[in-house]
Every structure is written in C-alpha cells, then in structure tokens.
Swiss-Prot record:
Residues covered by the Globin domain: 1-141
The name this protein goes by in its record: Hemoglobin subunit alpha
Gene giving rise to this polypeptide: HBA
Gene3D superfamilies given in the database record: Globins (1.10.490.10)
Entry-linked Pfam families: Globin (PF00042)
Source organism per UniProt: Vulpes vulpes (Red fox)
Phosphotyrosine modification, residue list: 24
Subunit (UniProt): Heterotetramer of two alpha chains and two beta chains.
Source lineage: Eukaryota, Metazoa, Chordata, Craniata, Vertebrata
Length: 141
C-alpha cells in the first residue's frame, strides 16, 4: 500500500524525470536485456543491440504506461487493466520479468538522479514498481 509520503515521492520524482522518461525506459530495457538475457526471448523480432530504435520505442511505451500509473496512483488496477490483459492473455510474459525490469528501472533512475535518490525515494519507487507489477500480473491467477 502506497502511503501519502510514497505518493508524494513518486509524483515528485516523476516530475523531475520529465521529458527523459522515454529515454530512461529504453535504458532500463537495455540494462534488463544485458543483465538478464532470458528476457530477450519475448522480443525475437527486435534489434536488441544497445540503443536500438526498437528498444528505445518499447522503452517509451514502458515509460508512458508508468506515467499513466503515476497519474492514477489511487486506481492502478483501473488505469492498467488493458495492459494487464495484454501481458497476461496475449503476450504471456513470465511475471518474474516485471521484477527484473523494475530493478533495472531503479538502477537507471539512481544513476541519472543520484542526489534525489534518497533511501525514502528508493523505497517509495520500489513499492510503486511492485504495485504496478502486481497489477500487471493479477490476471494470471
């Protein structure tokens, strides 16, 4: 459960990210593919080389979904329902991959915003990414 302080930290951090969210999403995907090569199996049709246009484009989709989630922190299931359906029923992404991507998103944000990435912000973002992952995997059950 996200506390009021968590919500403030999440919104504040996302505001600071601003127009870089898509770039960070692509970088986090690159990190995921490099650190956890099994995640590449869901993208056989992509050029998975670091910085490829396809990885950047998908990273922007990830960032856009997270931006939607930030705007709907009080109703993540409603805001992410269609995306949950897509990942559960069509793409059939193994739920562990959301945790791996979440970790890489945290690393990416910490690298780009080290001064703002306090322990409290880290904890809030971790809780947020976990909440998003939980929603995205809720229809698997």
């Amino acid at each position: 459960v996200l506390s009021p302080a968590d919500k403030t930290n999440i919104k504040s951090t996302w505001d600071k990210i601003g127009g870089h969210a898509g770039d960070y999403g692509g970088e986090a995907l690159d990190r995921t593919f490099q650190s956890f090569p099994t995640t590449k199996t869901y993208f056989p049709h992509f050029d998975l080389s670091p910085g490829s246009a396809q990885v950047k484009a998908h990273g922007k989709k990830v960032a856009d979904a997270l931006t939607t989630a930030v705007a709907h922190l009080d109703d993540l299931p409603g805001a992410l329902s269609a995306l949950s359906d897509l990942h559960a029923y069509k793409l059939r992404v193994d739920p562990v991959n959301f945790k791996l991507l979440s970790h890489c998103l945290l690393v990416t944000l910490a690298c780009h915003h080290p001064n703002e990435f306090t322990p409290a912000v880290h904890a809030s973002l971790d809780k947020f990414f976990t909440a998003v992952s939980t929603v995205l995997t809720s229809k698997y059950r």
